[in-house]
Regions:
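Acidic catalytic motifs of isoprenoid enzymes
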Residues: 1-166, 170-187, 194, 198-242, ...
Length: 294
């Protein structure tokens, strides 16, 4: 889960925008408290969303606290108090981030590979701690990445088979409670992983074609240029299918807190990103390049 999940700020009420920022900052502090500063460098809106959904069954929201941090050393910022949802999101964030390092190490060459190796060394201790807390999730993520590497080596043209690996990774970090909620969350985050993988593949078409890197969208539609206008409709349909399944799963959750904020992200934010990527005008964080600020 890296980079595409975010709310539409213009449609948020002030208290909802504040709440999103508080959870983002709260997750940063939860990661720092358990894993140190290193992994806070890879904090994302995606895992902030995961924390919101994971904690949505709670009836009450604890009052926010005010803390200083590396990004704001002189002024205390409002942030969410650490709770079970933020701890879970912190653990999940470390697992997914470290395995991303491992994936880069396997895929990249030259300086990029050396940098990935450095990140793996720096992140190893935190990863071992997170793996001890979520061993089943770690094994599922590892197996999914192995399957993805095999598909990449085969130059598999199936978008569904390739996206399934990402889906299994995001679903792996869902709490294993054995109840109906787990099944709903598993389906929800499976489809979120599918959507993320395919949106990322569309976004990377030009780069992957230039570098001759694996991209199932390019292979499936036998693209000769980065222009997707001829295949936009089927791409849009497959992305909308995942969005529809995500929306249906959310409707089954009956969240008790942060429902409107989560709904903004699912029903507005993700469709907006889909359109922007297909139109070729998607920009990270609305083009400001300042991560962590709505």
């Amino acid at each position: 889960m890296f980079g595409f999940i975010r709310p539409v700020k213009a449609e948020l009420r002030v208290k909802e925008a504040d709440r999103f920022q508080q959870v983002y900052c709260g997750l940063c502090h939860a990661i720092r408290a358990e894993y140190g500063r290193f992994y806070t460098l890879f904090l994302s809106y995606d895992m902030t969303f995961f924390a919101l959904v994971a904690g949505s069954e709670e009836a009450e929201t604890a009052p926010p606290c005010r803390k200083r941090c590396d990004a704001s050393p002189f002024r205390r910022k409002s942030c969410a108090e650490t709770d079970d949802a933020l701890r879970l999101a912190a653990d999940a964030s470390i697992l997914l981030t470290y395995h991303k390092f491992q994936d880069d190490l396997a895929d990249e060459k030259g300086a990029k590979r050396a940098f990935a190796a450095l990140l793996c060394r720096l992140g190893r201790r935190g990863y071992e701690k997170a793996r001890a807390r979520m061993p089943e999730a770690d094994e599922d993520i590892r197996q999914a990445l192995e399957d993805l590497r095999r598909l990449e080596a085969e130059r598999c043209p199936s978008m569904d088979r390739a996206a399934d690996t990402s889906s299994r990774m995001t679903a792996a970090v869902v709490p294993r409670t054995g109840d109906t909620r787990e099944r709903i969350l598993h389906q929800m985050f499976y489809q979120i992983g599918r959507w993320i993988y395919l949106v990322d593949a569309v976004q990377d078409i030009q780069k992957d074609m230039e570098e001759n890197s694996y991209n199932p969208v390019v292979l499936r539609y036998e693209l000769q240029t980065p222009d997707i206008s001829a295949v936009r409709e089927p791409l849009e349909r497959t992305l909308e299918r995942s969005l529809a399944d995500i929306c249906m799963a959310f409707d089954l959750l009956s969240p008790r807190r942060d429902a409107d904020l989560i709904r903004n992200i699912i029903f507005l934010g993700m469709p907006t990103v889909t359109r922007q990527v297909l139109n070729g005008n998607y920009q990270t964080n609305e083009g400001r390049g300042k991560h962590g600020s709505l």
